[in-house]
Amino acid sequence: MKRVRILRDTSGASVVIALVFFLICGIIGSVVMTAASVQAKAAQTHVDLQQKEYAMQSAAKLMAQQLGGEDAVWGERSVVVRIAYDSAGEMSVDTDSLCSMIGQNFWTEQRTKDILAARAEGKDYVLGGSASNRLRIDPPSEAGGLAPVYGCITVDPDLNITVELSLDSAFAADSPYNTTISIQCTPTFDSQGRVTVIEYGDNTPAKKTEA
């Protein structure tokens, strides 16, 4: 009895096997690419967070040093404002001894008078109190795209300064790295109880604001 040879066409099976193989490779490749993309995004997110944290730390240190008199110049505190009064009680403000750039820009003669006027009424003096007029601290261009930091400065009737800093101009409570700096004033008074010297140098460390 002769054997009947049956020729089977395996090309279809080969094509199916090939398609399954490429499908598996495609899935694996997709998983690898997705994992790489996720890893790259995670790495970029980490870098972004580091940059934001660095921007905040730098701004906080700058404000603490320049407004708080932390940087002593020639062995003396760098934020000292002197006030004199004439016979009519009119005040004159001497800011010549201010050495820090932010100190010089903040403690102008007119602003000093406004702060003391608010103090006389038992009120806070606030600079940058709303989202539309926040102080803005821009990092130098060579800093590589660091985020700007927004600030608000409050001087209370005891002349203590509170600086609030945020990466969000609206000061959202959940904004990362919100920071508060408290700077203590050491004022001097004359015999009539009037402020004659406003001096800073005992600032407390900057603290991250708890949400």
PLM features: what roles do these ranges have?
Residues K52-D71:
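N-terminal alpha-helical signal peptides/signal-anchor transmembrane segments
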Residues V32, T45, S58, G69-E70, ...:
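Alpha-helix boundary/capping detector
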